[in-house]
Amino acid sequence: MNDILIRIARRIKKNIIWIIAVPIILGAAGYILPSQIADQKSYTAEDTLAVGSYDHPVYNSTEEIPLLLKSDSFLKEALPDEKDEDVAEIKEKLTINTESKSLLTLSYSDEDKDRTESVLNAISSTFLKNDQKLYAEREAVIRSSIDALEGESVSEDSKVDKERFLYELKNTQLNLKAASVTDSETVSETAGGGMSPKKKAVLGVMIGLTIAFMFVVIPEFFRESF
């Protein structure tokens, strides 16, 4: 046993420089590299969308809207300056969740805060613009029907039917609703922050000491065994 300790001491003395250097290098690497990673952040912008109600098969459907918003044609309309590969990336980063029959949550994540907000804003704004146009067209048709029916002369026998039709049209007009964004926010999420730089530096030193111990001690025990 004394011989092993003597050989270990000699081995330590012979390799003292790198035995000290390895833990220091790994500790420094553990401090510097993780600190660079910890500084990276991703941002998520989120809009809550209240779906409109004017009997449109796509723009009033919480099942169809996610398909619409992720379609190439819609994204190119909303983001005309984006390249095809960028549109594909945006499609991957865009998340749409159905909260209820009339509410959707749109969220988009990116490392650049301004881009995160601008991309989601472009998507939401384009949807609302198209929705408002469709809503206005539907409302105009119903209003025109009401005006035409009110100005129409009918026989006494048809007055009841006329009043019933007018009631139904006016009730439909009252229930028409365009889509709207009810809530909007941007939150940041820090990536790579599981351990602080100091803790990772300590871990690097411990790994370095372990490597040095294995290099110095284990060969001597194997030599003793054989």
From Swiss-Prot:
Pathway: Cell wall biogenesis; teichuronic acid biosynthesis. Its main location: membrane. It holds the Pfam family Wzz. GO terms for cellular component: plasma membrane. It is a multi-pass membrane protein. Keywords: Cell membrane, Cell wall biogenesis/degradation, Membrane, Stress response, Transmembrane, Transmembrane helix. The keyword Transmembrane applies. The chain crosses the membrane at residues 15-35, 202-222. One of its GO terms (biological process) is teichuronic acid biosynthetic process. Signal peptide: none annotated. It is found in: Cell membrane. The keyword Cytoplasm does not apply. Induction: By phosphate starvation, via the PhoP/PhoR two-component regulatory system. The nature of the anionic polymer present in the cell wall of B.subtilis depends on phosphate availability. Under phosphate-replete growth conditions teichoic acids are present, whereas under phosphate-depleted conditions, at least part of the wall teichoic acid is replaced with teichuronic acid, a non-phosphate containing anionic polymer. The synthesis of teichuronic acid is accompanied by degradation of teichoic acid and reutilization of liberated phosphate for other cellular processes such as nucleic acid synthesis. This is Teichuronic acid biosynthesis protein TuaF. It comes from Bacillus subtilis (strain 168).
